[in-house]
């Protein structure tokens, strides 16, 4: 199990070009290549996972499939920290063996037969690595694409700052630095 600490900022699509040109991001080293991610989120028809603040997602990145389980996030001042479990998704079947919390795994196994796709996202992700000071490492991910549920569709455009190493306050400092130039956010 890992704990993800992140700050997500929803952006208007028109802000993307300026954000990419911001010196903080434009001069940062890239983490991998820009990729397209396809995600399907699952729940029961009664949305019981959502009710319990849990999520099950399958993600296709290139030719690789991953299954992710996330639990309720503790949100403090806009930062969210949540337990998550990730493992390969193979043979088009759910496998919750990586979930090391018995209560979560048992609940997922109970819901497993009734899990259905609820919505999908497809977006391009650009990732850079920010190291604002020694001992701090932040992934800055710009996502641009769509979210679809049934016949409905909406644009998805966000900046996600994920703390890999360091103090969570560094996420705020980076967001404030990006916001100083009003053209970028």
Show the residue positions of the predicted features.
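Phosphate-end processing signature that detects enzymes handling 5′-triphosphorylated RNA
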Residues: 1-183
């Amino acid at each position: 199990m890992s704990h993800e600490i992140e700050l997500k900022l929803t952006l208007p699509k028109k802000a993307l070009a300026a954000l990419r040109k911001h010196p903080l991001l434009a001069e940062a080293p890239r983490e991998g290549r820009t990729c397209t991610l396809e995600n399907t989120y699952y729940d029961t028809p009664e949305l019981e996972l959502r009710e319990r603040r849990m999520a099950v997602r399958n993600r296709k990145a290139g030719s690789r499939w991953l299954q992710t389980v996330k639990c309720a996030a503790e949100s403090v001042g806009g930062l969210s920290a949540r337990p998550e479990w990730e493992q390969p998704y193979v043979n088009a079947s759910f496998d919750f063996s990586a979930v090391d919390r018995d209560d979560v795994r048992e609940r997922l196994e109970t819901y497993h037969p009734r899990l259905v796709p609820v919505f999908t996202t497809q977006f391009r992700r650009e990732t850079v690595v920010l190291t604002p000071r020694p001992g701090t490492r932040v992934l800055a991910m710009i996502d641009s694409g769509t979210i679809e549920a049934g016949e409905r569709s909406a644009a998805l455009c966000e900046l996600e700052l994920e703390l890999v190493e360091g103090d969570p306050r560094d996420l705020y400092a980076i967001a404030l630095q990006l916001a100083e130039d009003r053209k970028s956010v």
